């Protein structure tokens, strides 16, 4: 896939009013502060396309980005962040699960996993949930550049052992762009 245009489309706080134009949706999901917004900026080669923050839980809405005028990248709120109120955390969780369960336009879910902490319970639960919903998913190990070589091998083995149903696993560094071409190649298979 060659991304020639990437623009913020709209944010939604509920499933009401989501686009109904039939474009496929590639959805990015993961724990809070896993690097979803940074990955989107890197993937689209557009710094500032998706708002980033060092504060976990910054993405609180469903954010749509129109890619090449023919599909959407969708940034969902992160899960697993403990420092927001219980009610707000439940609200994000309901928004995320309702979207994944009910949205017919989803072509692929891309689960971002912090390479420094592969195999966390919440990530495993998300994989099980995606399997249960029958959603095809791939995994991106983010922050790959932060690992030493021995840690990279261990992280890869760990995620492979718990992600047998993933369509792909890509190692990614938003900082250097390592893994970008491979991920775009994988996403292209689901962009039609």
Swiss-Prot record:
Q: Which residues form the EngB-type G domain?
A: 22-192
What's the superkingdom here?
Answer: Bacteria
Which keywords annotate this record?
Answer: Cell cycle, Cell division, GTP-binding, Magnesium, Metal-binding, Nucleotide-binding, Septation
Task: Return the GO cellular component terms, semicolon-separated.
Answer: cytosol
- Taken from the record, one Pfam family name reads MMR_HSR1
Q: Which GO terms describe its biological process?
A: division septum assembly
Please name the SUPFAM superfamilies in this protein's record. Answer: P-loop containing nucleoside triphosphate hydrolases (SSF52540)
**Family statement:** Belongs to the TRAFAC class TrmE-Era-EngA-EngB-Septin-like GTPase superfamily. EngB GTPase family.
This chain's function reads: Necessary for normal cell division and for the maintenance of normal septation.
> Could you identify this protein by its name?
Probable GTP-binding protein EngB
Source organism per UniProt:
Chlorobaculum parvum (strain DSM 263 / NCIMB 8327) (Chlorobium vibrioforme subsp. thiosulfatophilum)
């Amino acid at each position: 896939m060659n991304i020639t245009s990437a623009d913020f489309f709209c944010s939604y706080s509920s499933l009401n009013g989501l686009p109904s134009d039939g474009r496929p949706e590639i959805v990015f999901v993961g724990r809070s502060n896993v690097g979803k917004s940074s990955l989107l900026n890197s993937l689209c080669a557009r710094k500032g396309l998706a708002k980033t923050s060092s504060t976990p839980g910054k993405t609180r809405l469903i954010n749509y980005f129109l890619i090449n005028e023919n599909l959407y990248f969708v940034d969902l709120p992160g899960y697993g962040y403990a420092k927001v109120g219980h009610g707000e955390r439940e609200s994000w969780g309901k928004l995320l699960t309702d979207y994944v369960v009910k949205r017919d336009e989803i072509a692929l879910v891309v689960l971002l996993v912090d390479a420094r902490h592969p195999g966390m319970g919440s990530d495993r639960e998300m994989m099980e949930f995606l399997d249960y919903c029958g959603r095809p998913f791939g995994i991106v190990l983010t922050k790959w550049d932060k690992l030493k070589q021995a840690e990279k091998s261990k992280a890869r083995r760990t995620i492979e052992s718990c992600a047998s149903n993933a369509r792909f696993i890509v190692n990614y560094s938003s900082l250097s762009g390592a893994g970008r071409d491979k991920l775009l190649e994988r996403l292209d298979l689901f962009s039609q």
